Amino acid sequence: MSNATKFGKVAVLLGGKSAERAVSLDSGQAVLDALLRSGVQAEAFDPQDRSVTELVNYDRAFIVLHGRGGEDGQIQGVLEWLNIPYTGTGVQGSAIGMDKVKTKQIWQGSDLPTAPYRIITKETDLDSVIAELGLPVIIKPVHEGSSVGMSKVEKAEDFAAAIEKATQHDAVVMAEKWITGREFTISFLNGQPLPVIRLQPPADVAFYDYEAKYQRNDVEYGIPCGLSETEEKKLQALCLRAFQAVGAEGWGRIDAMQDEQGNFWLLEVNTVPGMTSHSLVPKAAKAVGYSFDELCVAILEQTLEGTA
């Protein structure tokens, strides 16, 4: 690519110290390879092994750090301080997007549909949670991605074990009302929604969990998604509002459900989605003609805005 020199020297930020390190290494290597094939002068940069102050030696950064330290505003803040352009969402939007409770509060305040929830503490009366949300519920660490530490709870006696599992990953845990229905994901490129994908995990999987996302090959991805054209546009418009409400920018992903009555519910936002062979943003981009390499360059081009 003859104009790849416009990017200068690019740090592909990957790895890090979060629970999603392994996924980030896979995503980052895929992005690095794509940029190199496209003629970009790109290098891997793992903040676990190097001081972030070394980023001053780069012209821009492609963030492929998942989870804490990479998706929560921390690395974005460092890059802002160093005056280095970077891909994706800024400091505030990243911090909000990494916090499932803050995200839901903003969506609720924006009159956007998201499932009812309760924050769980040691003092929480679990019977009151069940009375309010019903069963089943899904237990989630508030500050983890990739479904790390999540469990579906169908019986009251399983509540404590699910909370214990979640607290191994985060001090803050939430219970969310289980939505029965079809799961969809909506990817964004240049701030605009791509075609909706329907997620169909195999029958033995309770939900689209870490294993289904990264380790299994029997998850079905529906493109087209099975919604009518009107419904798909409605879901895209809803998710665009949700994406913008939390301050997300550029590229990302929102997961949503359609319940048995046909209502849509927002689940969560992902401001640095996976870029592995199993990942959803590349699948959605492919549906509108982007190769993986073209997608990576398009995401990187966001860093040129305002610098030309």
From Swiss-Prot:
Residues 104-301 form the ATP-grasp domain. One of its GO terms (molecular function) is ATP binding. It is found in: Cytoplasm. Its EC number is 6.3.2.4. It catalyses: 2 D-alanine + ATP = D-alanyl-D-alanine + ADP + phosphate + H(+). It holds the Pfam family Dala_Dala_lig_C. Binds 2 magnesium or manganese ions per subunit. GO terms for biological process: cell wall organization; peptidoglycan biosynthetic process; regulation of cell shape. Mg(2+) 2 binds at residues 268, 270. Pathway: Cell wall biogenesis; peptidoglycan biosynthesis. Mg(2+) 1 binds at residues 255, 268. Its cofactor is Mg(2+); Mn(2+). GO terms for cellular component: cytosol. Its main location: cytoplasm. Keywords: ATP-binding, Cell shape, Cell wall biogenesis/degradation, Cytoplasm, Ligase, Magnesium, Manganese, Metal-binding, Nucleotide-binding, Peptidoglycan synthesis. ATP binds at residues 130-185. The keyword ATP-binding applies. Belongs to the D-alanine--D-alanine ligase family. NCBIfam families: D_ala_D_alaTIGR, PRK01372.1. Cell wall formation. This is D-alanine--D-alanine ligase. It comes from Acinetobacter baumannii (strain ACICU). The gene is ddl.
